[in-house]
Amino acid sequence: MNEKTARQIAEMKNQTIGVEVEMNSITRQRAAKVAAAYFGTGRYENTAGRNGYSTWSAWDADGREWKFQKDVSIAGPDEQKCELVTPILTYGDIETLQELCRQLRHNGAKSDASRGCGVHIHIGAQGHTPQSLRNLANIMASHESLIAEALKLDRSRMSRYCRTVDPRFLEQVNRRKPRSMAHLADIWYTSNGASYGRSHHYNDSRYHMLNLHATFTKGTVEFRLFQFDEPTAERRGGIHAGQLKSYIQLCLALSQMAKDVRTASPKPQQNENPKYAMRTWLLRLGFIGEEFATARDFLTRNLTGDTAFRHGRAAA
């Protein structure tokens, strides 16, 4: 690994993280109790009066509040519509989050697109500028189809809750080249037809794979596109700790790349060999070595093609 890549990975890991995992088949009270037991604090309580959303909360040993909230978009009985909302995390907290998700799964929690469940990942917007966020929009636009294929994204979710970058936003942001966050916000909301209620949580502009509404209202860059695999004859599907870590690493890397590059193009990647395209892109993102082996596997396993040869292997 060269010095530039090592620095890229180190800076990537310095970003803050927030994660939302939607699930059902477990009540919010039960999920909070499981979390409190795992944290070793035993502290959990109903915090709906303060947090709304029929919330139950659990606290870890550092006094951080982990929330389990009701989200009406989740399928199933109301008492089992459960969304885990983490406190602000660092890279070193990922293993804690992974083990908590394992504990929730062992206690019956289920999550996949057929249940109306997704995974949303927030990366702290510190260090981002109008130019870096423009870069990020272009990076996403050029890779969204590849990512959707790699993750087998549910098409109904893509049409409603995690749409691709709006072409009107893409055209305007690249033509007008905003130099201030206020100007970027104006372009974001007007091009998405959502100038009303900019401060409202449920502003319609949020329903994109890349959600900059969160940037302007919460100080984070939100990636809303993720989901766990649905069960098959070969796999159990559902909540998977390794898959979750892979998603977090990808979001961190995307955010860092947007900061590092001078400009980025929205032109779609080659698609004659998707597996090769994904592998080479992941290497540019810094996914090198054993630490990123699981992510490389999850992000290429569903793609067709050859990871080693762009135009396929020569016949013997």
Where are the regions that the model predicts?
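C-terminal accessory/tail domains of diverse enzymes
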Residues: 1-113, 126-316
